[in-house]
């Protein structure tokens, strides 16, 4: 394989990663819309679409294997590029799984009228959505500052999760009639927090791609 063909295949790999990222991002957007509208049909569509994300991951990983097999020797920078792609794709697939978890929780709400605390969950969802978008932008732009900035925002998501979690437990202790709804809200918040962690992982991979240094910013 010539260098020119290798670089073209590598660029196509990145394009497929971004297509996968866009779909995973939309899954989260749709989750929050389904929660707001109490739309069980939309939640079901989210669940079914996860198979597409899984297939995209497998296809990208297969292309990575073929690329490594056909391009020898591989220089360190190229290997880092490929390794980063695999790591990010893995986190995007997990992100899609968490979208499914949220969609399933939405279906279990059974159309109950929302408690006012749902507004706090929408706020948390908006923060996570912006993190996903900006993490992918940081990867595309090779923007080190943006990658670190997105990681810092995960601390806000973690703090919000803890506060909402405690509020939900307090409300449950006072109003037993809302236990099912509030329990599902707990699940939604838990998975939003995990999505924030996955997004931080994407930024860590971008930092590694740019600097060659592995960092752990998910503490």
UniProtKB/Swiss-Prot annotation:
Belongs to the PhoU family. One of its GO terms (molecular function) is protein homodimerization activity. Induction: By phosphate limitation. InterPro entries: P_transport_PhoU, PhoU-like_sf, PhoU_dom. The keyword Nucleotide-binding does not apply. The gene is phoU. Homodimer. Plays a role in the regulation of phosphate uptake. Encoded together with proteins of the phosphate-specific transport (Pst) system in the polycistronic pstSCAB-phoU operon. It is found in: Cytoplasm. GO terms for cellular component: cytoplasm. Its main location: cytoplasm. GO terms for biological process: intracellular phosphate ion homeostasis; negative regulation of phosphate metabolic process; negative regulation of phosphate transmembrane transport; phosphate ion transport; regulation of phosphate metabolic process. This is Phosphate-specific transport system accessory protein PhoU homolog. Keywords: Cytoplasm, Phosphate transport, Transport. Transmembrane segments: none annotated.
